[in-house]
Structure formats: structure tokens, C-alpha cells
């Protein structure tokens, strides 16, 4: 399993198929699909496909993390280490 830890209970719940209170219901399916991609990845480069993931490294206070797009506003952010994802979170890190 590639996901070793979640940054918060909301992201963990979405991964488990739940729709937590306050979570945008219209994004649940896409978010869960993206989380499953992270979980299935054996190498970071696996997340370059499909291209609309827009895998990219983060900078500044999120240096050491990577992100993939859920939509124009939201991202799945995580730290990648030795083939596993840590501190996985669904977030709008621009706000």
C-alpha cells in the first residue's frame, strides 16, 4: 500500500468511501479516485498518468511535498518517501 498516513480524518474518511460533513459532495468521487491513484502508485512517476493529475513538487512552506490536481481549486498533497505516500491531504493550499 502506498498511502502510509493521512494528514487529517476528512481525507482518510473520503478514501474509505465516506462523505464527511462539510466535504464538497460533488468532489467526493473525483477525490476518492485520485486518492486511490496515490495508493496504487509504486513510484512517484506513476502519478504523471493521466496527465490531468498535473503532478508537481511544492515549494516554500510545503517544500518536500508533491501535489496532484482534483480540480482547479483543490489538490491532493503528500510527502513521497521510499515508494510510499505520507501525510496525504485534500486541500486548497492557495487559500
What spans do the regions from the language model cover?
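Intrinsically disordered, low-complexity boundary segments flanking structured domains
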Residues: 1-2, 24, 42-45, 55-56, ...
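Generic structural signal for well-ordered secondary structure
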Residues: 4, 28-31, 47-51, 69-71
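A short, surface-exposed loop/turn module that caps and links secondary-structure elements
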Residues: 42-66
Amino acid at each position: 500500500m502506498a498511502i502510509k498516513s493521512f494528514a487529517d480524518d476528512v481525507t482518510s474518511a473520503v478514501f474509505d468511501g465516506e462523505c464527511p460533513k462539510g466535504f464538497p459532495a460533488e468532489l467526493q468521487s473525483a477525490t476518492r479516485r485520485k486518492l486511490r491513484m496515490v495508493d496504487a502508485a509504486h513510484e512517484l512517476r506513476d502519478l504523471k498518468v493521466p496527465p490531468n493529475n498535473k503532478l508537481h513538487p511544492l515549494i516554500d512552506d510545503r517544500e518536500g511535498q508533491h501535489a496532484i490536481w482534483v480540480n482547479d481549486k483543490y489538490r491532493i498533497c503528500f510527502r513521497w518517501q521510499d515508494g510510499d505516500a505520507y501525510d496525504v491531504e485534500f486541500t486548497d493550499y492557495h487559500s
